[in-house]
């Protein structure tokens, strides 16, 4: 489902880039780089989890769909609130959005906004994800949670036309450069849906 936004004012569209992928794929690092490059508002999706979700994950228990629904609506709502601000050109959100149905919730939460929504899927191998989560400090998502995320992961398919896939296997610098080049061109051309 690709949503065509409503734009009654014919003003330039704003952008929402949602950086998605399992724990350890580099969502926060990539989102901050995109936000900084474009001058967009940055929203850390992890900060929008209800306290119960954070406690559950901290104890090593994976979230289920019911745990995620409210969080996904919080993520979509936070983006919508930022888009309503006149001074905001765009938003960059981190959100795992592991399943297509999760991405569909984000799509539907923004469908009546004059904004172009694009997902940036950070593709990484199991080994890379475990290595990265093992080396993180002070984060509630531990390496053992990677398996539960990979078990439910529905990688974006070709019919999800609003998804940009970036491999992170060649290192941070190369993946950031590739991603920044794509989003910078897209925004500068103000591509309409």
Swiss-Prot record:
Q: EC annotation?
A: 2.7.1.12
List GO BP terms, alphabetically: D-gluconate metabolic process; glycolytic process via Entner-Doudoroff Pathway; pentose-phosphate shunt, oxidative branch
Q: What is the lineage of its organism?
A: Eukaryota, Fungi, Dikarya, Ascomycota, Taphrinomycotina
- What cystine linkages occur within this chain? none
Example of a GO cellular component annotation carried by this entry: nucleus
Q: What is this protein called?
A: Probable gluconokinase
* Keyword DNA-binding on entry: no
> What pathway annotation does it carry?
Carbohydrate acid metabolism; D-gluconate degradation
List the keywords (alphabetical). Answer: ATP-binding, Gluconate utilization, Kinase, Nucleotide-binding, Transferase
- Transferase as a keyword? yes
Enumerate the SUPFAM superfamilies for this protein. P-loop containing nucleoside triphosphate hydrolases
Q: Where does ATP bind?
A: 21-28
Q: Which organism is it from?
A: Schizosaccharomyces pombe (strain 972 / ATCC 24843)
Gene3D superfamilies for this protein? P-loop containing nucleotide triphosphate hydrolases
Q: Can you state which reaction this protein catalyses?
A: D-gluconate + ATP = 6-phospho-D-gluconate + ADP + H(+)
A molecular function annotated in GO for this UniProt entry is: ATP binding
Q: What class of enzyme is it?
A: transferase
Give the family, as the similarity comment puts it: Belongs to the gluconokinase GntK/GntV family.
């Amino acid at each position: 489902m690709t949503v065509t936004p409503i734009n009654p004012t014919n003003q330039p569209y704003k952008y929402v880039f949602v950086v998605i992928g399992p724990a350890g794929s580099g969502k926060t690092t990539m989102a901050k780089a995109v936000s900084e490059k474009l001058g967009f508002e940055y929203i850390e999706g992890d900060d929008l989890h209800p306290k119960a979700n954070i406690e559950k994950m901290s104890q090593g228990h994976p979230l289920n769909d019911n745990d995620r629904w409210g969080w996904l609506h919080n993520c979509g709502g936070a983006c919508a609130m930022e888009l309503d601000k006149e001074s905001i050109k765009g938003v960059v959100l981190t959100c795992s959005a592991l399943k297509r149905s999760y991405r569909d919730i984000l799509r539907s939460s923004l469908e009546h906004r004059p904004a172009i929504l694009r997902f940036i899927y950070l593709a990484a191998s199991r080994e890379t994800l475990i290595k990265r989560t093992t080396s993180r400090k002070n984060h509630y998502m531990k390496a053992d949670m990677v398996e539960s995320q990979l078990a439910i992961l529905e990688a974006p398919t070709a019919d999800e036309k609003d998804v940009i896939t970036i491999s992170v296997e060649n290192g941070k610098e190369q993946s950031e450069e590739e991603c920044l080049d794509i989003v910078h061109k897209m925004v500068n051309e103000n591509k309409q849906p």
